Design a protein with these regions (language model features):
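A residue-level marker of the well-folded mature domains of exported/periplasmic proteins
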Residues: 1-182
Length: 182
């Protein structure tokens, strides 16, 4: 069959992703798959791939480009994920919570959409308030760092945590344990 997979680790930087896509275009690959770090800033490089006749498959995260610039998007409904998180939290807290939020990468489709979905449900839950929200960079280390800061500022007033992914949640749990809470 002769399939060769080429991979580039962009280190969570859009400029590195754009360089990698341009390199793949120059190599005349058959198809490009990309999980955009952020939603915006993709039109030029996607146009370059389109002009070269190389289809792009967008994975996990949307890119703010015309729909004919890529062949498909394989991903989740992040707005619904945010809604579901808020519904579950409302159930477990009887609709009363002082929430801290660890968001995903600023400007990314998952972070933007989970934020919107979560807050959509909170509008109908007056006893649930987000008291602090910050980018946790989707990592254990940053999740722990931000949660430690939340705890220093808000302490035991925090009654719930909404983390946009499991790595940040794991970091937050470590910070919570070090703070002496369970």
């Amino acid at each position: 069959m002769g399939v060769e997979l080429k991979f580039s680790d962009a280190q969570q930087k859009q400029e590195n992703q754009i360089k990698a896509i341009r390199s793949l275009i120059a190599q005349k690959v058959d198809v490009i798959g990309v999980a955009p770090i952020v939603e915006t800033g993709w039109v030029a490089v996607f146009q370059e791939a389109k002009d070269a006749g190389i289809p792009i498959i967008v994975v996990d995260r949307r890119a703010a480009v015309p729909p004919d610039f890529y062949v498909t998007l394989m991903g989740s409904d992040f707005v619904e994920e945010g809604r579901n998180a808020a519904r579950i939290m409302a159930k477990w807290t009887d609709g009363r919570a002082s929430i801290v939020e660890l968001q995903g990468t600023n400007g990314s489709a998952p972070a933007n959409d989970r934020y919107l979905g979560f807050r959509e449900i909170l509008k109908d839950s007056p006893g649930m308030k987000v008291i602090a929200s910050e980018d946790g960079e989707l990592t254990v280390a940053k999740g722990k760092e931000v949660m430690a800061r939340f705890l220093k500022t808000h302490g035991k007033n925090i009654t719930a945590l909404y983390a946009h992914n499991d790595d940040m949640a794991l970091g937050a749990i470590r910070a919570i344990e070090e703070y002496g809470l369970k």
